[in-house]
Amino acid sequence: MIGKLTGILDSVFEDHIILDVQGVGYVVFLSNRLLSSLPERGQAVSLFIETHVREDAIRLFGFETKVEQDWFCLLQNVRGVGAKVALAILSTLPPPQLAQAITLSDIAMISRSPGVGKMVSERIINELKNKALPSNAPHQSMPHFVSYSSETSSQAGTQHTGHQHSMDALAALTKLGFERDQATHALQEAIKAFEGETPSSALLIRHSLKLLSSHLK
């Protein structure tokens, strides 16, 4: 099995490249998004590799990050989704947006991918929404958040609950693949929007995702 390849970009085609690794040219299939961001020919390229072995062919699929490779594999666990469809989805939606679409059950967002209709989009959401989604977020200590408003010391318990909801929401957002600083900023804005209230972690996540989505468009 090949886990990773590092070599020189030899040739670029419509859906794949030839990567020269010490004189051996590997045909590696890539998403359109990755193809459009490649360096000039002759430059070094390093890719995580997923190998598909069939009776008539061996195909290599390349990814810029491990989390993209994990998404590629996870998507193919969904009935009716093969390598071609999985690449089409990753060509249209980077991991954070794909995770967001599944979390919010956003059929339209997934259906933007070429060759992916409403039925397949619904199936992806239904089969993956309760599963652990691939993430590159490291485990870190929780930051200090904007405090929920409090007028008396008797509300200390409410503040503690609110802070716990904030921590739960941040953990969920980073697990979805958002950068920690980006998720923290959106969450702080969400907390301000609920000033005087103690929203659940689910409400904070939904509000934060709307803010993050507006920045991604």
From Swiss-Prot:
Known function: The RuvA-RuvB-RuvC complex processes Holliday junction (HJ) DNA during genetic recombination and DNA repair, while the RuvA-RuvB complex plays an important role in the rescue of blocked DNA replication forks via replication fork reversal (RFR). RuvA specifically binds to HJ cruciform DNA, conferring on it an open structure. The RuvB hexamer acts as an ATP-dependent pump, pulling dsDNA into and through the RuvAB complex. HJ branch migration allows RuvC to scan DNA until it finds its consensus sequence, where it cleaves and resolves the cruciform DNA.
Homology family: Belongs to the RuvA family.
GO cellular component: cytoplasm; Holliday junction helicase complex; Holliday junction resolvase complex
Keyword Cytoplasm found: yes
Localization in the cell: Cytoplasm
Protein's GO biological process: DNA recombination; DNA repair
Quaternary assembly: Homotetramer. Forms an RuvA(8)-RuvB(12)-Holliday junction (HJ) complex. HJ DNA is sandwiched between 2 RuvA tetramers; dsDNA enters through RuvA and exits via RuvB. An RuvB hexamer assembles on each DNA strand where it exits the tetramer. Each RuvB hexamer is contacted by two RuvA subunits (via domain III) on 2 adjacent RuvB subunits; this complex drives branch migration. In the full resolvosome a probable DNA-RuvA(4)-RuvB(12)-RuvC(2) complex forms which resolves the HJ.
Species per Swiss-Prot/TrEMBL record: Bartonella bacilliformis (strain ATCC 35685 / KC583 / Herrer 020/F12,63)
HAMAP family per record: DNA_HJ_migration_RuvA
CDD domains the record matches: UBA_RuvA_C (cd14332)
GO molecular function, one term: four-way junction DNA binding
Region (Domain II): 65-145
Annotated segments matching region Domain I: 1-64
Region (Domain III): 161-217
Keywords carried by this UniProt record: Cytoplasm, DNA damage, DNA recombination, DNA repair, DNA-binding
Entry's free-text remark on domains: Has three domains with a flexible linker between the domains II and III and assumes an 'L' shape. Domain III is highly mobile and contacts RuvB.
This protein's name: Holliday junction branch migration complex subunit RuvA
Region of interest called Flexible linker, as start-end residue ranges on this chain: 146-160
